[in-house]
């Protein structure tokens, strides 16, 4: 699980990341958190995960990214609310 800190809400990040994740064939989810951060899980090819992280860095002002292991397996990618 990734937690993105910075200017990450109110900029269309979830919708744009959803589209990119679907096009890359990744599974997982993305959602806004109450504290102003964005939480995301990406599962799939490691190079594609690196690519989507770089994509997010290009469309949002990221101050910090935290990473935590997530053992849950996902079958598709979705926006959570």
From Swiss-Prot:
Record-annotated Acylphosphatase-like domain positions: 1-81
What's its catalytic activity? Answer: an acyl phosphate + H2O = a carboxylate + phosphate + H(+)
- The entry's active site is 14, 32
GO molecular function terms listed in the Swiss-Prot or TrEMBL record: acylphosphatase activity
The source's domain of life comes to Archaea
Q: What family does this chain come from, according to its entry?
A: Belongs to the acylphosphatase family.
Q: What is this protein called?
A: Acylphosphatase
Q: Which organism is it from?
A: Picrophilus torridus (strain ATCC 700027 / DSM 9790 / JCM 10055 / NBRC 100828 / KAW 2/3)
Q: What is the lineage of its organism?
A: Archaea, Methanobacteriati, Thermoplasmatota, Thermoplasmata, Thermoplasmatales
């Amino acid at each position: 699980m990734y937690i993105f800190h910075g200017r990450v809400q109110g900029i269309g990040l979830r919708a744009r990341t959803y589209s990119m994740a679907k096009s890359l064939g990744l599974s997982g989810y993305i959602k806004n958190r109450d504290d102003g951060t964005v939480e995301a899980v990406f599962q799939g090819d490691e190079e594609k995960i690196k690519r989507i992280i770089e994509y997010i860095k290009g469309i949002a002002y990221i101050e910090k990214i935290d990473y935590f292991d997530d053992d849950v397996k996902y079958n598709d990618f979705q926006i959570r609310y």
